[in-house]
Amino acid sequence: PDAVVLAVGATPTVPPVAGMDSPKVVDCVTALTGADLPGQRILVVGGGLVGCETALGYAQAGKTVTIVEALPDILSAGIPVPEMNASMLRDLLAEWKVTLRTGCRLAQVTAEGAVVTGPQGEATLPADHVVLAVGFTPRPSLAGELAGTGMEVYQVGDGSKVGSVMTAIASAYTVARAL
């Protein structure tokens, strides 16, 4: 081939804290694809759009849900959420009684749940499952190995830079037009 287009996507980011190998830890992709998590208490780490939508889904399924967000407010990092959507999502989280723990960081996953640190110090939050929604990391690709082969190599979508479906489509379109 004269050119190779790599669209390898991204993987959920796993924070470097103790307990990530626990069977109670689930990434957001697994959670959003309809994973039935046994138990009642779900702790979602990350208050961006993916974390909030995941939390809302489990709350609507009858689970008791807490969001732990390191920043002072949810929906304040990552891809900007239009204000009307953010307002509606905040209202739905309140209506479904999702607990928000902002300004808190995950310190450890334990048999009881998770240890978080925040303005009031350290606290253990009981949880049957901990869902990680702290972002995505571009998946490694063959771009480096293909360099110097004489082929044109293009990376598109989340494989080059994590974004939205719109940015993925735009990057693929740009490459397709160039070819």
Residue ranges and their predicted role:
Residues 10-15, 102-113:
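A conserved short coil-to-beta-strand element within the FAD-binding core of flavoproteins
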